[in-house]
């Protein structure tokens, strides 16, 4: 080799030279061998030259794998591939990036099937140490110095490509890679991947059964959770009964419910079941649902403190995070444990109080302990009687309205002495009980003795739950030698902002263990009612009750075609900026009636595409103009308005016009609009009603002057949040009544149609801008007339001036005016009403 021209060229150039890279491609394609094997690395000239075998493998050879033809891969190629350097200190493995780049090439033997085979051969902990750490830190976008990573490129492509144009094999390869990417501990990366996966399933639903068969038994619950949450999101756009039946038959219901206890998977399975049931899909296992009412798991066995101490050194980070109230996971993420009682469903007819728990526990102990506890109860009773006697004696001689006696010691000297004697004896009795109880029950004994007189519901033992999570997270394979380096580098408290979405592998195991624990608890213990006013939480129904659903894969709506026709093209009266003003102009602006927009023009919008008119049923607009110069004499100008609407009986309209025109209409809760309680998925509506008590019923106006009239909202409001974060997501949907009465069906872009015509929409779902509710004027006017109903608008807002430099310090003088507008749609389709302004200056 050194003697010929190629050899001389190699001796003079680095492995990254373009010609060397070309040779690394052409030689295996033409001669079925690798360039690196043609070089005599023991030749003196190659020993002393700049070219190095390992560098050639790491650069030119590695590059060639991503561009060579599919027939240029051999066993020798695979051997050299395994020799590519993998710097352990960065946790980035170029070999995985190569496989991701090749993953979608159908004819390539190194496509996603190879990646799949490699990952399946590894046990879950080793796979997380090699693969999950890599994908957690290797998802980044393009910037001035770097091109986008292969992971980001693939996921973004999957989020935009017309999946229907891909072959079935390509769809399977894409889904395979996306599923394996969901094992990451990078939260944002996982969310992007799940959205791309749900989109794939929605556009290629025929492939869902393949992925169910191929991935339901993977030993990584992150992946299985993502699989079924994506399937659920996708099928909510399907109505093909044959397809849904095939999907239902392919799901291993029993195995997932009994062998993979995971409350997130159960939530997705329940959603799939409920949706299928709503369409009368056959082949559904009705005998298994609701899952928590058909127990299938063995009774929980909790490790004790000694069990945790035995493994604490090996899993110290997990123990710190999940094993106490000092760690964020144990304190905050596991807070929902308190929503269950400590009473097993098998032990009683309802959740027991602390008093009942104590009595049952000590009644089961030895006769000596039971006798000691009986004496404690007798002494407790005597103490309470003394307190009652003292209080009664005080009230006989004092006003019954004087509650200060609760804070006074009302006992006489004899009573005080008796109390001291009782307290001394109680301490003796409790110590005697502790001596006779086994050490394993010491903590429980102390808790029960302390709470023996409480009539509050006995909550689930959170410390026991924390120990369970620690033990099971550790048993998933967490080891210091595998993960501590990664966690110290990328998950420490001083990490840069772009790494904040990367979680510890240990936290992944904690999350999985908690999902498992909740599956057990939900079917074995009583739920503790929170006694909310608006929703019924008397029993456990699903994870939405404690905000445990993480993301809504159905929002924004999953588009299942390229159709954009018949979407409204709106021409509307805009009021989204303030004019340039001097200080004098500002004073006039805030006090002038003429600077209020004409709301009759705002609430009716023309549609260029269909010559239709739209009625604006809900909107919120806010505009602010702050002086750029901090020393300017100008004030900050703020302006906002809120548009509400509802329907009333036409016969009631005459009783509402005058009070409506004179009332303050600024309150954000002026009109009650049912919502999804931040946890019902966008596309679960209207088929599934997680909160039946929120169905719209006739409401009464809070304003006293309008309170004689009842109304109903035509809307439902969607927003999203879960236990770890809230989002700005908002959208409007038609009320169930409107859907039923106008026979509306859900469209491609979140719009609602009747007879193939869009009747209701929120333009925010297909174009940038704020969320608004629009309804076809023609359709709504006909509906109102047929049902003797009237549509009214209640609009309120304010204009405000203030000095931003002094406001926070001295609450400087504010110039302020409130305005309102009351409009209604008359029987001829005309908008009528008035608007007014009330000026108010305050300090």
What does each model-identified segment do?
Residues 123, 127-159, 224-228:
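HEAT-repeat alpha-solenoid elements in large eukaryotic scaffold proteins
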Residues 38, 44-46, 51, 76-84, ...:
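Extended repeat-based interaction scaffolds and adjacent low-complexity, acidic/S/T/P-biased segments
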Residues 2-24, 209-301:
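Extended charged low-complexity segments that act as oligomerization/scaffolding linkers
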Residues 4, 34, 74-83, 96-101, ...:
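Amphipathic alpha-helical scaffolding segments comprising HEAT/armadillo-like alpha-solenoid repeats
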Residues 9, 13, 25-30, 67-72, ...:
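Residue-level signature of the C-terminal ends
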Residues 1, 161-233:
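Extended amphipathic alpha-helical scaffold segments
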Residues 85, 104, 120-127, 139-140, ...:
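HEAT/HEAT-like alpha-solenoid repeats
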Residues 93-97, 113, 191, 224-228, ...:
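Alpha-solenoid HEAT/ARM repeat scaffold
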